[in-house]
Amino acid sequence: MFGGKGGLGNLMKQAQQMQEKMQKMQEEIAQLEVTGESGAGLVKVTINGAHNCRRVEIDPSLLEDDKEMLEDLVAAAFNDAARRIEETQKEKMASVSAGMQLPPGFKMPF
């Protein structure tokens, strides 16, 4: 099934290497900062890889406008930042498993 003992041992070695790479990648992702925008850049929200809000920037012109619109723009900017960090996480995690010769449908135990 795995090409003999060497095949299984090699597979386990690959799994361990992948686990180490994924742990390192998760640490790197936690340090990332991504900025989401709404209202053509009038509202900007910066979050880190753990989805913690680090900074909110609001163009002064919005402070004179409708409070409800401003709240919607802040929420939209946060959602944009969250989407961007998710995309970045997927890309980085995909790069960790690239090149590994795993059987189709193989699930990592971590």
Swiss-Prot record:
Protein name: Nucleoid-associated protein KPN78578_04440
Stated role: Binds to DNA and alters its conformation. May be involved in regulation of gene expression, nucleoid organization and DNA protection.
GO molecular function: DNA binding
Keywords: Cytoplasm, DNA-binding
Localisation: Cytoplasm, Nucleoid
GO cellular component, one term: cytosol
Self-association and partners: Homodimer.
SS bonds (residue pairs): none
Family: Belongs to the YbaB/EbfC family.
InterPro entries xref list: YbaB-like_sf, YbaB/EbfC
Origin species: Klebsiella pneumoniae subsp. pneumoniae (strain ATCC 700721 / MGH 78578)
One Pfam family per UniProt: YbaB_DNA_bd
